[in-house]
């Protein structure tokens, strides 16, 4: 678990992963400041914490394919969004992670 996840006291359960989306662009390529309605959600996120793991049919815990600190690609509508102390986080299932980017 990352220091940030520990400080927040968030521990995902099962095959869930706590991620923080990368910061959104606040200006366009031409230098125009974008209003909140024009910003798009980033699909890149940093893995902050891993759950306990998914169990197979024999009850064995399967290892995660990602690790804390990885930059992953997730769908912009994936997971459950939550805001803690003004910061936005997303809890996704491992199956919602499409790729590891690092």
UniProtKB/Swiss-Prot annotation:
Coiled coil: none annotated. It comes from the Bacteria. It holds the Pfam family Cpn10. GO terms for cellular component: cytoplasm. NCBIfam families: PRK00364.2-2, PRK00364.2-4. Together with the chaperonin GroEL, plays an essential role in assisting protein folding. The GroEL-GroES system forms a nano-cage that allows encapsulation of the non-native substrate proteins and provides a physical environment optimized to promote and accelerate protein folding. GroES binds to the apical surface of the GroEL ring, thereby capping the opening of the GroEL channel. Its main location: cytoplasm. SMART domains: Cpn10 (SM00883). The lineage of its organism: Bacteria, Pseudomonadati, Chlamydiota, Chlamydiia, Chlamydiales. Keywords: Chaperone, Cytoplasm, Stress response. Belongs to the GroES chaperonin family. The keyword Cytoplasm applies. GO terms for biological process: chaperone cofactor-dependent protein refolding. This is Co-chaperonin GroES. The keyword Cytoplasm applies. One of its GO terms (molecular function) is ATP binding. It is found in: Cytoplasm.
